[in-house]
Protein backbone atom coordinates (compact mmCIF):
# COMPACT_ATOMS: atom_id res chain seq x y z
CA UNK A 1 0.00 0.00 0.00
CA UNK A 2 1.47 3.40 -0.93
CA UNK A 3 2.24 5.91 1.79
CA UNK A 4 0.01 8.95 1.91
CA UNK A 5 1.62 12.36 1.52
CA UNK A 6 -0.21 15.46 2.76
CA UNK A 7 0.62 19.16 2.74
CA UNK A 8 -0.25 21.58 5.51
CA UNK A 9 0.79 24.46 7.74
CA UNK A 10 2.68 24.12 11.03
CA UNK A 11 0.46 25.40 13.86
CA UNK A 12 2.56 24.33 16.86
CA UNK A 13 6.24 23.61 17.49
CA UNK A 14 6.25 23.61 21.31
CA UNK A 15 7.01 19.90 21.73
CA UNK A 16 10.47 18.39 21.37
CA UNK A 17 10.96 16.63 18.00
CA UNK A 18 7.24 17.04 17.21
CA UNK A 19 5.25 19.57 15.22
CA UNK A 20 1.50 19.86 14.72
CA UNK A 21 0.44 20.30 11.10
CA UNK A 22 -3.02 21.53 10.08
CA UNK A 23 -4.13 19.91 6.80
CA UNK A 24 -7.11 21.44 5.03
CA UNK A 25 -9.25 19.57 2.55
CA UNK A 26 -12.05 20.81 0.30
CA UNK A 27 -15.00 18.87 -0.99
CA UNK A 28 -18.42 19.46 -2.48
CA UNK A 29 -21.25 18.86 -0.03
CA UNK A 30 -23.51 16.15 -1.53
CA UNK A 31 -26.79 17.85 -0.61
CA UNK A 32 -25.95 21.56 -0.70
CA UNK A 33 -23.63 21.35 -3.75
CA UNK A 34 -21.40 23.88 -2.00
CA UNK A 35 -17.63 23.69 -1.52
CA UNK A 36 -16.86 23.00 2.14
CA UNK A 37 -13.50 23.31 3.92
CA UNK A 38 -12.54 20.88 6.67
CA UNK A 39 -9.24 20.74 8.54
CA UNK A 40 -7.49 18.19 10.73
CA UNK A 41 -4.37 18.37 12.89
CA UNK A 42 -1.62 15.76 12.53
CA UNK A 43 1.35 15.27 14.88
CA UNK A 44 4.50 14.80 12.81
CA UNK A 45 8.06 13.81 13.75
CA UNK A 46 10.64 16.60 13.33
CA UNK A 47 14.01 15.15 14.38
CA UNK A 48 16.07 18.34 13.99
CA UNK A 49 13.44 20.78 15.24
CA UNK A 50 13.93 23.09 12.24
CA UNK A 51 10.31 23.84 11.35
CA UNK A 52 8.54 26.87 12.82
CA UNK A 53 4.93 28.05 13.07
CA UNK A 54 3.59 29.16 9.69
CA UNK A 55 5.86 26.95 7.56
CA UNK A 56 4.15 24.94 4.82
CA UNK A 57 5.41 21.35 4.97
CA UNK A 58 4.82 17.96 3.35
CA UNK A 59 4.27 15.01 5.69
CA UNK A 60 4.36 11.29 4.92
CA UNK A 61 2.58 8.45 6.67
CA UNK A 62 4.87 6.00 8.49
CA UNK A 63 4.80 3.34 11.20
CA UNK A 64 3.70 4.54 14.66
CA UNK A 65 6.43 6.51 16.42
CA UNK A 66 4.45 7.27 19.58
CA UNK A 67 0.86 7.35 20.79
CA UNK A 68 -0.08 10.25 18.49
CA UNK A 69 2.69 10.37 15.87
CA UNK A 70 2.25 8.40 12.64
CA UNK A 71 3.70 11.02 10.26
CA UNK A 72 7.19 12.30 9.43
CA UNK A 73 8.14 15.60 7.81
CA UNK A 74 9.49 15.22 4.27
CA UNK A 75 10.29 18.76 3.18
CA UNK A 76 9.39 22.41 3.45
CA UNK A 77 7.22 23.79 0.66
CA UNK A 78 7.44 27.40 1.90
CA UNK A 79 8.95 29.18 4.88
CA UNK A 80 6.85 31.51 7.01
Curated annotation (Swiss-Prot):
Belongs to the universal ribosomal protein uS17 family. PROSITE patterns: RIBOSOMAL_S17. This is Small ribosomal subunit protein uS17. GO terms for biological process: translation. One of the primary rRNA binding proteins, it binds specifically to the 5'-end of 16S ribosomal RNA. The lineage of its organism: Bacteria, Pseudomonadati, Pseudomonadota, Alphaproteobacteria, Hyphomicrobiales. The keyword rRNA-binding applies. GO terms for cellular component: cytosolic small ribosomal subunit. NCBIfam families: PRK05610.1, uS17_bact. SUPFAM superfamilies: Nucleic acid-binding proteins. It comes from the Bacteria. Keywords: Ribonucleoprotein, Ribosomal protein, RNA-binding, rRNA-binding. Part of the 30S ribosomal subunit. The keyword Ribonucleoprotein applies. One of its GO terms (molecular function) is rRNA binding.
Amino acid sequence: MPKRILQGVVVSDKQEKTIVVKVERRFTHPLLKKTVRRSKNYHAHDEAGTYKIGDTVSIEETKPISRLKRWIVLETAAKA
